[in-house]
Amino acid sequence: MRKTILVFVSILMLLQAAAVRLEAIPAFARKYQMTCKTCHSPFPKLKDYGEEFAGNGFVIKDKDAPRYYVDTGDDFLSLLRDLPIALRLEGFVTYNNANSQQLDFTSPYLLKFLSGGAITKNIAYYFYFFFSERGEVAGIEDAFIMFNDLFGSDLDFYIGQFQVSDPLFKRELRLSFEDYQIYKAAPGDSQANLTYDRGIMFTYGLPSNTDITVEILNGTGIGEANPLRNFDSDKYKNLAFRVSQDMGDAFRLGGFAYLGKEAPDNISNSMWMLAADATVSIKPLEFNLQYLERRDDNPFFAAPDLAPAEKVKTRGGFAELIYLPKGDDSRWYLLGLLNWVDSDTSELDYGSATFHYGRLLRRNIRATVELTYAFKSVYDKHVRMAVGLITGF
């Protein structure tokens, strides 16, 4: 164990020595010639201003990017002069992942190609493509068109594929190697969870600092089309509703409801989810809390004439505490994360406690050390260690 810790410390020192010589600017910072910390603290975690920027179609109001469009002489054409692109590269060295008792060079863990921006006034796009995700070409995950400020109001419309949980907490922008496990939980053969799906989303902000989100979804994830060239495997659509209320500058409370039905082979499973979440932000601390209840009436798709349907209860959540000693100007931070999933389907049961230390080597280069104790898992109790380097440029 002592030798393993020495190896981890040595690797972290090598990563820091190599990374301090690198410099890069992500796509939106490049476009507006602004620092990454305008929207991120630390990257890729979004600040409130970053959320506002994304909600405005990746445009800073009252600030035009110089020479953003090509002047073709056709006023009816909006043609980007340069395609906004960025890359995100992550690599880790892990020990005892999934209780394997192995030291593993998990690098590159992912290599992501990102592009996004305004196509024209109030219309924007965003997508990213995985050149590599844990050793395979995973393809497109987020990919959508956004219509901003419809009918002159604060109503926004998205169509494409996105994470269902994005209006709650954005798991793709989390700081930890450890995931938000409850968002991935789906009992039996159900395809519906709170990760990626295809559909449409409406968002609306009220003057009372109330944010409302409605999602209409296929409920089948983002797999390939069937032989009929349909992405959905049945005639049903799932509905998600979200409301979030700011209560002053330091506290936010949210609620979420999900109602769905799936019948891939004409045998149905009906489900619902209810969730509550909260954020308390009192500098230099931020505390995020998520709780979710889920019910499925036939997630194993038992045929009524052959076997009785098995109802499944699933519940869980996470609690995350982030410490930024100097706020936006912090060069290092600490994070603690508790995960909990409890289900009638035992393979979903999970519990873990994570401690994470991160240090910015540059504004867009982050080195991390993470220790996770999984006290409930299909792999039995175990400790996982990970040292990582995350870059965006």
Predicted feature locations:
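Outer membrane beta-barrel
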Residues: 44-47, 80-95, 99-222, 235-239, ...
